[in-house]
């Protein structure tokens, strides 16, 4: 075994390591470079699209200091693979005193993979204010522990034991408690971290309503992939303790599903809202399988 292969095999994902990946470095005028990490134990060679979404949020925050990232919309046109870095090129659409917008083109190896639109502004005083109430679900201590191999992160599911199982049948909704330790002090990294999980359970949410199908079959008998994700951050953006991710699948058909979601603090503050379009289609003969533990 080569030294590099041994290094990859021994990699243990940590929250600190994930935040390092999010913290992209400048590489020229309006250009940033981000690392993709290692495949790790699950042998997954495809980078999570939300990892690059998180990197784009950080890049735009660095480009527009003094402004707050309020929303981001990503289209995942081509997979990013583990290994080579990605380049994030910012096209500044407009930059004013109170708002700024950039289109982020993400390339790897000279090929465009992801396009994002990110909006920022300077938060103002309230004219009016209301929010969606946090769902009345069991507390984290009463929820089911879920295996998620990352040091510094805990996941607990409400009313679901194995989110991948085709035997987990219920309404097309999922509630997940998530805990990070430590919570990033830099707000752009905190927003990137919240955005990162928005793509993890959407497909499972949709499949839950249909008997005999689950994400354990993803890339074995069905082809699945998030294709777009949108996330909006609500000010003031801050939390301590646990986060509750609520997912609701409002439609699936013709090979695509749509999920909308919300992120509440344990105290009940709505800090983010998100949406996901995902592909759910019969497996093509050209598709390849991945290990079950990487499908969460």
What are these regions (language model features)?
Residues 1-296:
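Terminal targeting signals and extreme-terminal segments of soluble enzymes
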């Amino acid at each position: 075994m080569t030294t590099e292969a041994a290094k990859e095999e021994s990699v243990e994902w940590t929250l600190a390591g994930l935040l390092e990946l999010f913290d992209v470095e400048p590489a020229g005028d309006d250009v940033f470079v981000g690392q993709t990490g290692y495949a790790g134990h699950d042998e997954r060679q495809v980078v999570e699209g939300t990892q690059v979404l998180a990197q784009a949020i950080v890049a735009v925050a660095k480009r527009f200091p003094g402004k707050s990232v309020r929303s981001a919309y990503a289209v995942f046109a081509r997979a990013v693979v583990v290994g080579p870095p990605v380049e994030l090129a910012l096209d500044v659409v407009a930059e004013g005193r109170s708002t700024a917008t950039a289109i982020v083109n993400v390339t790897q190896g000279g090929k465009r993979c992801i396009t994002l639109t990110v909006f920022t502004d300077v938060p103002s005083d309230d004219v009016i204010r209301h929010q969606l109430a946090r769902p009345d679900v069991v507390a984290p201590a009463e929820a089911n522990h879920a295996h998620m191999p990352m040091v510094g992160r805990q996941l607990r599911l409400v009313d679901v034991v194995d989110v991948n199982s085709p035997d987990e049948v219920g309404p097309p909704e999922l509630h997940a408690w998530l805990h990070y330790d430590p919570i990033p002090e830099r707000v752009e990294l905190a927003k990137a971290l919240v955005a990162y999980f928005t793509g993890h359970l959407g497909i499972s949410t949709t499949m839950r309503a249909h008997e005999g199908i689950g994400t354990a079959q993803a890339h074995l008998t069905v082809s699945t992939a998030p294709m777009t994700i949108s996330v909006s951050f609500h000010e003031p953006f801050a939390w301590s303790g646990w986060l509750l991710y609520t997912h609701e699948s409002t439609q699936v058909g013709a090979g695509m599903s749509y999920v909308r979601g919300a992120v509440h603090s344990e105290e009940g503050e709505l800090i983010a809202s998100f949406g996901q379009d995902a592909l759910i289609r019969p497996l093509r003969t050209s598709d390849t399988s991945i290990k079950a533990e990487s499908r969460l």
